[in-house]
Amino acid sequence: MNKPVHNKPVHNNEHRRKRFNKKCPFVSAGWKTIDYKDTETLKKFITEKGKILPRRITGVSSRFQGILTLAIKRARHIGFLPFVGED
């Protein structure tokens, strides 16, 4: 049987990213829920185009990501936040 010849290592350490343990800002602050009327807090978790930032970027826990998403959607429907970002 012919075995393939590999000149490169299987795991290339140059392209690995360092992982940082991000703490959920809501858990560390002791929040129980997120209010949809608190637009200043909600704007921190929305991109310039109006998209909700993912957990891997914000560091929000799974529980609070769901609560945060629901609060942002409620604020959008009531009119506190825009659906589309500002140009």
Curated annotation (Swiss-Prot):
Keyword field: Ribonucleoprotein, Ribosomal protein, RNA-binding, rRNA-binding
GO (cellular component) term, any one: cytosolic small ribosomal subunit
Protein's UniProt keywords contain RNA-binding: yes
Superkingdom in the source lineage: Bacteria
GO molecular function: small ribosomal subunit rRNA binding; structural constituent of ribosome
Disulfide bonds: none
Listed SUPFAM superfamilies: Ribosomal protein S18
Region annotation Disordered: where it falls in the sequence: 1-21
InterPro entries per UniProt: Ribosomal_bS18, Ribosomal_bS18_CS, Ribosomal_bS18_sf
GO biological process per UniProt: translation
Signal peptide segment: none
Family listed: Belongs to the bacterial ribosomal protein bS18 family.
Subunit structure: Part of the 30S ribosomal subunit. Forms a tight heterodimer with protein bS6.
General function of this protein: Binds as a heterodimer with protein bS6 to the central domain of the 16S rRNA, where it helps stabilize the platform of the 30S subunit.
The protein's name in its UniProt record: Small ribosomal subunit protein bS18
Gene this protein is translated from: rpsR
